[in-house]
Amino acid sequence: MALGNGYYCAVVCVVLACASVVLCAPAQLCAGAADDDPRAARFCQALNTFLELYAEAAGEQVPEYQALVRDYPQLLDTGMKRQDVVHSFLRFGRRR
């Protein structure tokens, strides 16, 4: 019976995790504040779109982000200084 309680606890944890993701969705920052100015409305729409995409990427639900993390793990390693020559040329320019 203890094994059944473990499964019950796991199911409850998964349901709570899914509910917290749904409830923590980013709020619309300027939903009705920019109705008079069309430029402000476009800016607010772009800002809200960016925040939604950022929230998805932060949750690692975007396939492109997962592919980048999988294919280029050295980009995530910030503990070491980069040693490749191309990086120094891009940073300082190539002397002739």
From Swiss-Prot:
Origin species: Agrotis ipsilon (Black cutworm moth)
Protein name: Myosuppressin
Keywords per UniProt: Amidation, Cleavage on pair of basic residues, Neuropeptide, Pyrrolidone carboxylic acid, Secreted, Signal
Family under the similarity heading: Belongs to the myosuppressin family.
Main function: Myoinhibiting neuropeptide.
GO BP terms in the entry: neuropeptide signaling pathway
Cleaved signal peptide residues: 1-24
Propeptide feature ranges: 25-80, 96
